[in-house]
Amino acid sequence: MVGISELSKEVAKKANTTQKVARTVIKSFLDEIVSQANGGQKINLAGFGIFERRTQGPRKARNPQTKKVIEVPSKKKFVFRASSKIKYQQ
């Protein structure tokens, strides 16, 4: 798994800048994606994928210990759908 420090190191090399600047740009970019998705927007990055916030409706679930059926309330999920360009890339 690659963390933000490894990612910022590689971005800094390719952008010919410092790792600190690269880390700030990456964090700002990710914060803005989350902010826009939370505001109800779909973020479409051509050739990469779509980020969005979706509502999962309420559902029934079973407690495995008591076997009792419970109602699970609806919740908002953060979803990413990969572009076919990267989904099937080798």
Swiss-Prot record:
Database matches in SMART domains: BHL
PROSITE patterns the UniProt entry points to: HISTONE_LIKE
Keyword terms: DNA condensation, DNA-binding
Alphabetical list of InterPro entries matching this protein: Hist_DNA-bd, Histone-like_DNA-bd_CS, IHF-like_DNA-bd_dom_sf
A GO MF label: structural constituent of chromatin
Similarity comment: family membership: Belongs to the bacterial histone-like protein family.
Source organism (scientific name): Thermoplasma acidophilum (strain ATCC 25905 / DSM 1728 / JCM 9062 / NBRC 15155 / AMRC-C165)
Protein name, entry field: DNA-binding protein HTa
